[in-house]
């Protein structure tokens, strides 16, 4: 099973930059999108062979997730947990026979870490949610998780220390998640690979210079580790400030 995750930074804009051609090229069983900034009624495009599920923020033109899938899920749910987490369209959970798929757009901690307190609450509650799902069947958790977990996961760790996405608190929460029975699929296959990034600032020619961050992930329940066929970052794909990440599972 081939799964793709991509923060498209506005799907309407990405549609004008080859999104449908990318979908044909990717030939994925499931495509998970973050930061769609689109409501379902605005989706005036054809994607034959895929069912489409949307979770939009209350605020127009903000956040949002989508799952496009060839296989009809057993169930689909939106958001999770407390009411505070249910207004920004950040999570879709699709249940398949072999696993739960959780597509997530994690809240950014913002400049001066002004939203860090909420981010910590989100991380704890989402980890509890994933662990609860994992008691029933394995979990595939993907998306823009807005954290570079280790120094190897960004080009300039020293100058970005305590910036949003590389604060001690954020990477500690990722460490805690992985210690709770989950595996970062890319690092499982490539523990020492450098220069592997999924997001680049639009400033300072960051993408040209590969001054990036790896903040987009596929994370799976530990018991799916032996099912991982490949985990890749398609850095050559443009259309957003992020690139797609890809997971192939033998399920």
Language-model features: locations:
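N-terminal, active-site-proximal structural segment of metallo-dependent hydrolase catalytic domains
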Residues: 1-47, 51, 57-63, 78, ...
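Active-site-proximal beta-strand elements of phosphoester/diester hydrolases
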Residues: 1-9, 98-110, 142
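Active-site beta-strand/loop signature of hydrolases that rely on acidic residues for catalysis
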Residues: 7, 23-41, 101, 130-151, ...
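Metal-dependent phosphoesterases centered on the DNase I-like endonuclease/exonuclease/phosphatase
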Residues: 30, 51, 122-211, 215
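Structured beta-strand-rich core segments of catalytic domains in phosphoester-bond hydrolases
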Residues: 37, 43-109
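Conserved beta strand-loop-helix elements of the APE1-like EEP
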Residues: 60-75, 204-226
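Active-site beta-strand termini and strand-to-loop segments that position acidic
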Residues: 70, 94-97, 221-222, 247-251
């Amino acid at each position: 099973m081939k799964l793709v995750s991509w923060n498209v930074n506005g799907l309407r804009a990405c549609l004008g930059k080859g999104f449908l051609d990318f979908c044909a090229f990717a030939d994925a069983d499931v495509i998970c999108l973050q930061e769609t900034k689109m409501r379902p009624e605005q989706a005036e495009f054809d994607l034959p062979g895929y069912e489409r599920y949307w979770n939009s923020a209350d605020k127009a033109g903000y956040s949002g997730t989508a799952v496009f899938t060839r296989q009809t899920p057993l169930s689909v749910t939106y958001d999770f947990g407390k009411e505070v987490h249910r207004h920004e369209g950040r999570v879709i959970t699709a249940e398949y026979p072999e696993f739960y798929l959780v597509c997530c757009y994690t809240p950014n901690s913002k400049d001066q870490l002004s939203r860090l307190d909420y981010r910590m609450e989100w991380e704890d509650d989402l980890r509890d949610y994933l662990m609860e799902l994992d008691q029933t069947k394995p979990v595939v958790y993907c998306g823009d998780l807005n954290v570079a977990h280790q120094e190897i996961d960004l080009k300039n760790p020293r100058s970005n220390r305590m910036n949003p996405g590389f604060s001690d608190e954020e990477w500690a929460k990722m460490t805690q998640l992985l210690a709770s029975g989950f595996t970062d699929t890319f690092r499982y296959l490539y523990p020492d690979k450098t220069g592997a990034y999924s997001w680049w600032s639009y400033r300072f020619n960051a993408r040209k210079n590969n001054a990036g961050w790896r903040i987009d992930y596929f994370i799976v329940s530990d018991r799916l580790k032996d099912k991982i066929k490949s985990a890749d970052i398609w850095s050559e794909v443009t259309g957003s400030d992020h690139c797609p990440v890809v997971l192939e599972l033998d399920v």
